[in-house]
């Protein structure tokens, strides 16, 4: 994507879109971890409070000229006040997907004779994730029993998904800000990115998507996993 004509807008529910301007943003996104979008905005509205931002839906749009290139949708989970220079107020926002809310609650409960799709649907619905995409290519039989013991709903879900060989990500719409949580058990559920070229020039850029920076990293990780079942009555 060329830097020429590139601009960014942020729409926050309940706040007039033209009253804010995106100063900078950073998006941290990985498989099987809820993303975090940090946005620094400037506004001529000096009297905005935390209640005007928190829990409100927000959409960051990346534009190339007058054409939207990408949307990132979520809700505002954190807000802090920045500098007031007399004519603009700065606000720093943290935006996360609805799944992130599942990490705010801990619970003790037992699920019996339910498969991973049913258990996931229950917890996701409780977290406010109304729509999600179970992209399952393999059978996932019902479990005799499954215990959530003092874990957060998010910790419990991610543990179960890891045990079932599942990973998750946010699938963004290309034609609009529609965005859904996708839970997948095979790379066949991923959209191919095609071939990406390498272009270290971030000032001029090119007309297509490319990699501008990469790093090599190595670390020690577990090489095997042992599991053990216990009798439940």
Regions found by a protein language model. Give the residues of each.
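Amphipathic alpha-helical and helix-coil boundary elements used as assembly
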Residues: 1-233
